[in-house]
A protein has these predicted regions:
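Bacterial Sec-dependent N-terminal signal peptides
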Residues: 1-21
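Carbohydrate-interacting/catalytic domains
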Residues: 19-65, 71, 104, 110, ...
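Short, flexible loop/turn elements at secondary-structure junctions
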Residues: 37-41, 70, 94, 123, ...
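Active-site-proximal helices and loops of the catalytic beta/alpha 8
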Residues: 183, 193-274, 290, 301, ...
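Short, solvent-exposed helix-loop connector elements
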Residues: 283-289
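Hydrophobic targeting/anchoring helices
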Residues: 296-304
Length: 440
């Protein structure tokens, strides 16, 4: 009987991986928040971070993505604390953060607050002193001409050793380590680092086996259409770079619309939209550096167009600081001036079906795209639900004339809390870098 049940599950998952929905039902209207445990609190521990869970729940966060929680290698370490992405042991916890029981308590608290938690998974490489090397598995790695471990080619990652995906035993060990966190800590999925550098057939196999343990949510740090075979969500890197370009007058606002026009991803796949993340913040600058005075305008855009909105820890404090990557650099939580701003955006995404993810929601209908004035107006609607968004990316005050048969009735203003009756023709005023969001 057990064999028959296992075969049935395998066949169901095989069908799922060949065109049906992969994403768990709970993700349909989810939002996501990236957590850097080291920098989140002065203590830099799971226990200290846990005090923020109720606040994040209230802010409208559904998925917590934790940057790697594993021990960091000592060999060739960068800085005094090292990179999270140079992993020493896939089945252990970084002692900086606490122990496995501390992590399990955090996961339980997250679940008790009706949220989900995924962890960063670095499958492309390990630290050179990973336990696999200690165990004599040197053949699990890419070796140079002299038979030594080597970092991933084309990078400055001298603190890691590249893995060899031609080795089937290594693949099995990797999947088993991923299963470890499902069975021992009850996490809800993985954000997979440089996922496009790992063969897609590995990810398909991994997804199939993981889903047989627990239905997982999978996020790929990649923007390649083949990733949809195994992942529920990929990065919206192209959109992010267009937003930076518009802010810096290197791109036109029409490039934003064109991005969605040419999208060929399956309708049930999610893209992750963001104005910041750990890579952008530490290496390319804060959103204030990259986007200037329009950083909030782009946050509104990224939260309300098609895609799942990401908030990087500290953005709700107007974090205008590049967090150090290899050293302790605690976020200052005294100034929480954007908590209400992000709470409004995230909770609207969660509650209004027009904004839901993939084909649970709707595509944006751009009714005004003005390159000269740097303004955009779009509508998203699903059934009787509708969201209207007007954005001014320029430093000049604007009055925009709206004409659309799609608009009619009483609308709520997201930020002013006022109710407004509108019809197919009306005017809307926008301050420099201003925005208005109406919904029903």
């Amino acid at each position: 009987m057990n064999k028959i049940l296992s075969l049935f599950l395998f066949l169901c998952l095989s069908i799922s991986l060949n065109g049906q929905k992969l994403a768990p039902e709970w993700s349909k209207n989810a939002t996501i928040y990236e957590v850097n445990i080291r920098q989140f609190t002065p203590e830099g521990t799971f226990k200290a971070f846990s005090e923020h869970i109720p606040r994040l729940k209230q802010m409208g966060v559904d998925i917590l993505w934790l940057m790697p929680i594993h021990p960091i290698g000592l060999k060739n370490r960068k800085g005094s604390l090292g990179s999270y992405y140079a992993i020493r042991d896939y089945e252990a916890v970084n002692p900086e953060f606490g122990n496995l029981n501390d992590f399990k308590e955090l996961v339980k608290l997250v679940h008790d607050n009706e949220m989900k938690i995924i962890i960063d998974w670095v499958a492309n490489h390990t630290s050179p002193d990973n336990v696999w090397v200690d165990q004599g598995h040197k053949d699990w790695y890419t070796l140079d001409s002299t038979g030594n471990l080597q970092p991933t080619l084309g990078t400055d990652w001298w603190d890691v050793a590249d893995l060899n995906y031609d080795n089937q035993e290594m693949r099995k060990a990797m999947i088993n380590s991923m299963k470890f966190w499902l069975t021992n800590a009850d996490i809800d999925g993985f954000r997979c680092d440089v996922a496009g550098w790992v063969p897609i057939d590995f990810w398909v196999d991994a997804r199939r086996e993981l889903d047989m343990v627990k239905k997982v949510f999978m996020l790929a740090e990649a923007e390649e259409i083949q990733m949809t075979k195994a992942f529920d969500m990929t990065y919206g890197w192209e959109l992010h770079h267009i937003m930076n370009g518009v802010a810096q007058d290197k791109k036109k606002v029409s490039d934003l619309e064109n991005y969605f026009k040419k999208d060929q991803y399956p309708s049930d796949h999610y893209k992750m939209n963001f104005t910041s993340n750990h890579d952008e913040n530490s290496w390319n600058g804060t959103e204030m550096e990259r986007m200037g005075n329009s950083y909030k305008t782009f946050a509104v855009f990224a939260s309300l167009v098609d895609g799942m909105p990401l908030v990087y820890n500290g953005q709700e404090t107007s974090l205008n600081k590049r967090l150090r990557f290899f050293e302790k650099d605690t976020i200052d939580w005294k100034k929480m001036d954007l908590v209400t701003f992000y709470s409004d955006l995230l909770n609207l995404h969660r509650s209004n079906p027009a904004l839901w993810n993939g084909d649970f929601g709707s595509k944006p209908n751009f009714i005004i795209v003005d390159d000269k004035k740097k303004s955009i107006v779009f509508i998203r609607e699903k059934d009787k639900h509708q969201v209207f968004c007007a954005l001014n990316f320029s430093d000049k005050k604007q009055t925009i004339k709206i004409k659309s048969n799609l608009l009619n009735g009483d609308y709520n203003n997201l930020f002013s809390r006022e109710t407004k009756k509108i019809n197919s023709s009306f005017k809307i005023g926008l301050e420099p870098y201003g925005y208005q969001v109406l919904y029903k």
